[in-house]
Design a protein with these regions (language model features):
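Nucleotide-sugar donor-binding and catalytic loop/hinge architecture
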Residues: 62
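Short, conserved active-site loop motifs that form the nucleotide-linked donor/cofactor pocket
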Residues: 46, 65-66
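Active-site region of PLP-dependent enzymes
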Residues: 56-58, 66-162
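Generic hydrophobic alpha-helical segments
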Residues: 1-2, 71
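PLP-dependent aminotransferase-like
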Residues: 3-59
Length: 162
């Protein structure tokens, strides 16, 4: 989403997982820290992009946003790695799909496509997707962990972020 929207600067809470600040560094995005006590999700800066990596609640999608979910091993639907972006913007969904899939459309052999956008090889393998479908009923019937701000360290005191 940050690449798709060509975001130049973001802010994130002091207490969060390290992946968003690392991604900002990787993409050359200016990073600012903010004091925020958040629960379940937070907006990334002044964007409509939401870090919802620990959110697990029925009908929780916020319209006109990009909600980034995580299936990392400590999450409620644990697949080891990977995630999903929820959006109701069909054009953006197609662009993001192409970005995740080497810049190509998934249903046409790549050699037959005139690839017009860069891709990043971030797609979920069919095997991981199948595992997710197998685990989904149990995840839906199990109460999720309620993460709190204390579950996250203050990243600003880590050497890498000084």
């Amino acid at each position: 989403c940050l690449r798709d929207q060509e975001i130049k600067k973001i802010s994130v809470p002091h207490r969060t997982y390290i992946s968003v600040p690392f991604l900002a560094s990787k993409l050359g995005i200016e990073l600012r820290w903010r004091d925020e006590v958040w629960q379940d999700y937070y907006f990334i800066g002044d964007t409509n992009i939401i870090d919802a990596a620990v959110l697990w609640e029925k009908n929780s999608y916020i319209p006109n946003t990009f909600m980034c979910l995580s299936f990392q091993f400590r999450k409620h639907l644990s697949l080891g790695r990977g995630g999903m972006i929820l959006t109701n913007d069909e054009e953006a969904a197609l662009r993001l799909k192409k970005m995740s899939y080497d810049g190509r459309l998934p249903d046409i052999p790549w050699r037959e496509q005139d690839i017009s956008s860069i891709g990043y090889h971030y797609y979920m393998t069919p095997e991981t997707a199948q595992l997710g479908l197998q685990k989904l009923p149990a995840a839906m019937s199990t109460k999720p962990k309620k993460w709190t701000i204390e579950d996250w360290p203050d990243l600003t005191i880590m050497e890498i972020f000084k």
